[in-house]
Structures are given as structure tokens and as C-alpha cells.
Amino acid sequence: MKVTKISAITIFVKNMKDSCMFYSSIPKFEISYGGPDSNFTTFKISQSPDMYLNIESLSSKRKIENTCRIIFHTEDVDALYYYLRNDDIISNLGKFETKPRDADWGERYFQMYDPDGYEIVFATPID
């Protein structure tokens, strides 16, 4: 028996509207449940295999620790980087940490942060 995929990741956000705008601006991230006026929103990222990102409104009693890194594989990391850099919503609400670069572990990747400071990595395996 083995784990074969990540089905969903849930992160807690301070502002659901900003987070919905941010994640909706990433190509192929589609809201399948909830939305900007909801306390819980699910984005369907992939159908084969099914993969989801959940964002949940942070209650005033809970503190964000920003201890999560989300790594998404993409078909073309460079094209996605330039697309996101030129997207007004992503550029205004997110923060880019690196440009695309090759890593020793066999991926080309870039890092950025979402509106709540969660680290997001987009990567493409290097052939």
C-alpha cells in the first residue's frame, strides 16, 4: 500500500475575496465550491488525477503560521511565470521570490507568495 497523490491542500486565509481573485487568476484553477463570499472555497486544479486546493477563512482566534509550501507541477514553468508576472491581480496581491531556474533535483521552478504569505512553487520536471 502506498500514497500515490495529493488529493487536496487546505490553507487558511485572511481575506477570502483577495485569495479567490489571486487563485482564480492562475490558469486552470476553477472554483468548484464556495467563492469570494463564502467561508470555504475549493478550486479544482486537475481532473486526471483529481487535485484540489481548499481555502478557508481564518477565524479571529486563529493565527496564520505560514508553515505551508505548496508545490504545483506545470507543463511550462517559464510560460506560466511570464503569464503570472503580467497578470495585474497576481502582481498586486502576490510576491515573486525567484525567477524560473534549474534545480539540482531535476526540476525547473520558481517561487512566490500568495496574499497570506504562503509559499507557492511552480515546477516542471527537467527531461
What are the roles of these predicted feature ranges?
Residues 1-20, 70, 124-127:
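N-terminal beta-strand motif that seeds the catalytic metal site of vicinal oxygen chelate
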Residues 13-16, 70-116:
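Vicinal oxygen chelate
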Residues 25-32, 88-91:
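Conserved acetyl-CoA-binding loop of GNAT-fold acetyltransferases
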Residues 16, 36-37, 47-48, 105, ...:
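Short strand-connecting beta-turns/loops that link adjacent beta-strands
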Residues 17-26, 110, 119:
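Conserved active-site alpha-helix within GNAT-family acetyltransferase domains
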Residues 2-5, 62-67, 103-104:
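Short glycine-enriched loop/turn motifs at secondary-structure junctions
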Residues 30-66, 119-124:
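Conserved short beta-strand elements that form part of the metal-binding/catalytic scaffold
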